[in-house]
Amino acid sequence: MSLATPDGGPRRATIQSVERAARILKLLGAGSWRLGVTEVAERLGLAKGTAYGLLRTLEAQELVEQDPETGKYRLGPAMLQLGNAFLDNHELRARSLLWADSLASRGAEAVRVGVLHGSNVLIVHHVFRPDNSVQILEVGASIPWHACALGKAIAAYLPDAQRRSLLDSGLVPLTGRTVTDPATLEESLATVATAGVALEDQEAIVGEAEIAAPVFDDMGHSVGAIGVVGPVERLVPDGRVSATLLAAVRETSRGLSRDMGAGRVRSRGPAARP
Amino acid sequence: MSLATPDGGPRRATIQSVERAARILKLLGAGSWRLGVTEVAERLGLAKGTAYGLLRTLEAQELVEQDPETGKYRLGPAMLQLGNAFLDNHELRARSLLWADSLASRGAEAVRVGVLHGSNVLIVHHVFRPDNSVQILEVGASIPWHACALGKAIAAYLPDAQRRSLLDSGLVPLTGRTVTDPATLEESLATVATAGVALEDQEAIVGEAEIAAPVFDDMGHSVGAIGVVGPVERLVPDGRVSATLLAAVRETSRGLSRDMGAGRVRSRGPAARP
DNA sequence: GCATGTGTTCGACTATATCGAACACTGTTT
DNA sequence: AAACAGTGTTCGATATAGTCGAACACATGC
């Protein structure tokens, strides 16, 4: 009955049923199609009755929906609302709105803001390139950290231990140019750390590049990154990084970092009701 | 504290701790700022230790984050990812992408697609008006059903019992023109049902109007709605609804409904691997 | 310095979640 | 037709696993 804690991590008390419920949610979210009770039970190693009870409870909360025809389950609408609520409460995102807008118009490129989540970068804000082209919204998407400039910018300023674990955790290639060797990646992170800016040249999507810089809080931790994405021809013309964009990104990240740091140091909880 | 199940639905067993965990998440999502353990415990009527255990478990799953400085809790990044996963699995949204795009360019207005969630309409897709103006993305937002055309369009075709409960559940005014009287609202729903299209004229935001039509699945249930939003001057010039937009919305909703119905009737699970 | 606040820990109690087998139902196979 | 292999669902016995409440350590403000 006892689930052994994997690789002898610190054994903190966790509530079993809630953990299982969370894993069900992630399971439904990961696989891109609806699952049945038996499939859920199998994949999590639970009794069918147990999985059913959990699903029923989640359904009552509208975190999960059941297709009335097939009886299978999928994520529910409350999930979207909570996801949105996360964004509303997100400090980095809130503070980045104005900076991202101005960076987008100044650089005439799309802007993304991301934070580290596991070994991926989670996009928390996205401003479209200011032209009429059709673009898809990427907020909520997650990108392997080593395949985007945002991720490298964050990783470069992480405490050693954390950076190590990132480097060691399965680096999968997305394009032919994705760097997956930990050693060379570590070197490039050192370069990023001295330059203060990270680059990505078709390592995630062929034809697209990114220039990004880290964002720090008042403790000096890299809590996220902001950068511009766009076609290689414009970001890296003739193999050289556009100096204009580079300066714009750097200055924006500094301004945003100042915002983040100042918010905590100067006044403790200015927005809270007294 | 107890939400009465609409029309006396059967009360089944639910797992206590999971339900409590879900309520914690909603609490963190609703109040727009981070909460402490004691506050959570108070608002849910739990022992402090219990609330702590739940929060710890949710934190381990990254559904909740703890501010290392203040010790207070907020929603975590996994929430955003799950919210996004909900969208990816959402059938109506998936099928509406193309229709919404074409409606937006045909009508030169912003397009929204929504579903009913509780007594609100949850926006699951949003196409910006095809001009260069700055617009904010509304996906994930929820709007009181009686204050938007999407909501009226859905409600007009709901089973009697469900429509009743909507009419009876606290209708709050958002602007001076919001209709909050159940009787007059019911009348207007009857009109909507015969016309096949719903209107909204500055009932949610001053200066903005909306034209929407319902979307049906193969069972004939109104599972959502699609419509255009924009300034009153363009949607309702001189007090008359733009005939062009009205036709466009109507035709789009019919096409989308056909998509939704056809997907289920013709082939059972065409997208599933064999 | 005390008084109040916080988040956190711990152990005893029993309410509570888990299991596993049996159920009703559907569509397919024989 | 009838037996089969699936599904989601129900139910009751068992002891596990979650809940409570008091005590803890730490921070803040009087």
What are the language-model segments listed below?
Chain A
Residues 2-4, 132-206, 274:
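Short, solvent-exposed recognition segments
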Residues 2-94, 254-262:
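N-terminal helix-turn-helix
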Residues 27, 43, 94-106, 112, ...:
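Amphipathic alpha-helical regulatory segments at dimerization interfaces
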Residues 69-169:
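Amphipathic alpha-helical effector-binding/dimerization core
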Residues 195, 206, 223-274:
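Juxtadomain coupling helices with adjacent low-complexity linkers
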Residues 215-218:
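Sensor-regulatory modules in signal-transduction proteins
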